[in-house]
Swiss-Prot record:
The gene is act18. Its EC number is 3.6.4.-. This is Actin-18. GO terms for molecular function: ATP binding; hydrolase activity; myosin binding; structural constituent of cytoskeleton. Pfam families: Actin (PF00022). It comes from Dictyostelium discoideum (Social amoeba). It catalyses: ATP + H2O = ADP + phosphate + H(+).
């Protein structure tokens, strides 16, 4: 089979959302929640022709009688049976393709355990019978989507954040820093501070409302303390939000207090460094000769970097940390929510990439460990 003639499939599996589509496209065709729902009680719903499992939005809309599970926790796959269900749903329901006819590019988080990489490879070749596959690091793909091969990426999604220094297309393993603070933690914090204001959000449906408030109304303050004073002395920063039942609530300083936790994890009672310090610490672990290329190419990626004001604040914080002669540049592309997927789409459609795929023949000869040889991704 001539691989060039067939469009490759690109799947970016995140802790919260799965993004999937075809290489060469400029956006994913399918974006759905990475959840698997299974009936809580057998027999009760048989009359309605109930299925054994539901994926994504289908699972969400039936959550009343399903047990919902996220197979990816903090960026790492923890349940392979459920993960397989999500991939099956992606191929057959979302994209309407036969996986045995398309090469598949999957994404992984930095420092993904070796056995996980092997398991992904095994499932693609043995369960889905793909003709070829490849596994690429999410942050490296984000960098590609910005048209660069050297830079530092702060990738922050729903489950986990990483600072990854990349030189000429290869991640520098010793400089990868992980931060277990991301979108889910910000939503929990928003719920906590709104509860203190007297609003109550407890059910799963209400948690979705919190997420919506966070995504629509939050922003990052350039100067947090000054913004707190402004919020205390006037109502200019207040916004109204209409709940599904028609009730209108007011959101004030919560708008910027919520994402402030990215810069001040102590607000969540966490002792870790903020995202700005994490970027700085990653750069400082790199060779002194390449630091200026990293400071000059700071790429923000992932849904939890979508807050208005985040790039200006990052510039201010890094300028304060870096040597005074260093030129700082923050790149925050408007489509950065999907930049990992877009980078995968670009990579998989390059003619120079076609020899990089792991073929079915190579897999049959070497087994799952072939993934470490063919998809090294790291600078040796």
């Amino acid at each position: 089979m001539e691989r060039e003639e067939v469009q490759a499939i690109v799947i970016d599996n995140g802790s919260d959302m799965c993004k999937a589509g075809f290489a060469g496209d400029d956006a994913p065709r399918a974006v759905f929640q990475s959840i698997v729902g299974r009936p809580r009680y057998t027999g009760v719903m048989d009359v309605m022709g109930q299925k054994d499992s539901y994926i994504g939005d289908e699972a969400h809309s039936r959550k009343g009688f399903l047990t919902l599970k996220y197979p990816i926790e903090r960026g790492i796959v923890t349940n392979w049976d459920d993960m397989e269900e999500i991939w099956h749903h992606t191929f057959y329901n979302e994209l309407g393709v036969a996986p045995e006819e398309h090469p598949v590019l999957l994404t992984e988080q930095p420092l993904n355990p070796k056995k996980n990489r092997e398991k992904m490879t095994q499932i693609m070749f043995e369960t889905f019978n793909t003709p070829a596959m490849y596994v690429a690091i999410q942050a490296v793909l984000s960098l590609y989507s910005s048209g660069r091969t050297t830079g530092i990426v702060m990738d922050s999604g729903d489950g986990v954040s990483h600072a990854v220094s990349i030189y000429e297309g290869h991640a520098l393993p010793h400089a990868i820093l992980r931060l277990d603070l991301a979108g889910r933690d910000l939503s929990d914090y928003m719920m906590k501070i709104l509860t203190k204001r007297g609003y109550s959000f407890t059910t799963t449906a209400e948690k979705e409302i919190i997420k919506d408030i966070k995504e629509k109304l939050s922003y990052v303050a350039l100067d947090f303390d000054a913004e707190m004073l402004t919020a205390a002395s006037s109502t200019t920063l207040e916004k109204s939000y209409e709940l599904p039942d028609g009730k209108v609530i007011t959101i004030g300083n919560e708008r910027f207090r919520c994402p402030e936790a990215l810069f001040q994890p102590s607000l969540l009672a966490m002792e870790s460094a903020g995202i700005h310090e994490t970027i700085y610490n990653s750069i400082m672990k790199c060779d002194v000769d390449i630091r200026r290329y990293l400071f000059g190419n700071v790429i923000l990626s992932g849904g939890s970097t979508m807050f208005p004001g985040i790039a200006d604040r990052m510039n201010k914080e890094l300028t304060a940390l870096a040597p005074s002669t260093m030129k700082i540049k923050i790149i925050a592309p408007p489509e950065r929510k999907y930049s990992v997927w877009v980078g995968g789409s670009i990579l998989a459609s390059l003619s120079s990439f076609q020899e990089m795929w792991i073929s079915k023949e190579e897999y049959n000869e070497s087994g799952p460990s072939i993934v470490h040889r063919k998809c090294s991704n790291y600078l040796k």
